[in-house]
Amino acid sequence: MEKIRFSNAVLALEPQMLAWRRHLHAYPERSFEEAETTAFLERELLAIGVDKIERPTKTGLVARVFGSGAGRPAVVGVRADIDALPMPEENDLPYRSTVEGVMHACGHDGHAAMLLALAKLLVNARTSFCGEARLIFQHAEELPPGGAIELLRAGAVEGVDAMLGLHLSSNFDTGVFGVKSGVLTAAVDRFNVLVRGRGGHCAFPEQCNDPVVAAAET
């Protein structure tokens, strides 16, 4: 597919991408609980017409598109995470979270929408590539050890020649991509910080070691 024609196809998909992203944003689900999210993605992928859809894990999803173009066949995987965070959304957007205490605050709704758009572009460009495009919707990225381990153990990336991960970033201007070969922000972890102090009267802060103030400064 020529570069200009592909760019025009992407721009034509913008309204649909926005609709996908806003739907996902309105109905966020926490790690390992993405049942409705995965069901929505599966319905959309079926409508798009991908060649194969698999559920290798309870809430993970893999879609495959096979190309019929000339050249050496290769299997290229693209991964997007789909889970939300356990935090409230404090705005009045028409597509704000409808789930109390849960929101897409890390862009995973956008990631999933982009991967759906890629699926549609690839289905319409089968003759432009040879081999397989494997689209992996990863559950539970936010909660270690995460859904990636489950997908790996389930064989979701077996036979993949090259793998692309993606993440939105406020470090770049709109429309700008940053690319790095190898590992980049490929781990997540949690830790607790314990602040010890000695409380006292707020009128005499100099006579106590207030743990609240210390924690706020940490």
Name what the model sees in each region.
Residues E2-H104, D109, A113-F129:
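Acidic/His- and Gly-rich active-site-bordering loop/insert found
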Residues V62, L85-M87, N91-M103, D109-G110, ...:
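Histidine/acidic-residue-rich, glycine-tolerant segments that coordinate divalent metal ions
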